[in-house]
């Protein structure tokens, strides 16, 4: 028997797939519906952390450039998911990975890892805290 609030591996994979799909379509309402109110987004390489659904949605909506997210591999095993994706920004492409924590059918934490260190783009200081 599955404890209350737990999801199946298929449900976690579906949630992670929907995350990538709604980002790519820029469907901010649907994207926000996948996130917990108190979602935490972390970028270890830039030492940035964003807390809360509204800030995380805005962070993505305001992200500069012509960017695209193409899933390569989606894994899920409650309460965790993983997305290997091709990130394309202004014509340049790279692989990256995101790890997800899921609780009660919503994403509560996202950690993005990139192949190279980088400095965050300017103009998002109002949304992030630096570690």
What label would you give each PLM region?
Residues 29-78:
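A solvent-exposed, acidic/Ser-Thr-rich amphipathic alpha-helical stretch
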């Amino acid at each position: 028997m599955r404890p209350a609030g737990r999801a199946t591996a298929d449900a976690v994979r579906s949630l992670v797939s929907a995350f990538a799909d709604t980002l790519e379509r820029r469907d901010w309402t649907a994207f926000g519906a996948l996130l917990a109110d108190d979602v935490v987004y972390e970028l270890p390489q830039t030492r940035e952390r964003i807390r809360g659904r509204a800030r995380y949605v805005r962070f993505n909506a305001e992200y500069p450039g012509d960017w695209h997210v193409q899933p390569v591999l989606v894994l899920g095993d409650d309460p965790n998911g993983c997305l290997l994706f091709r990130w394309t920004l202004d014509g340049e492409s790279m692989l990256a990975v995101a790890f997800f924590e899921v609780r009660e059918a919503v994403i509560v934490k996202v950690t993005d890892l990139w192949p190279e260190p980088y400095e965050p783009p300017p103009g998002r200081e109002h949304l992030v805290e630096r570690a």
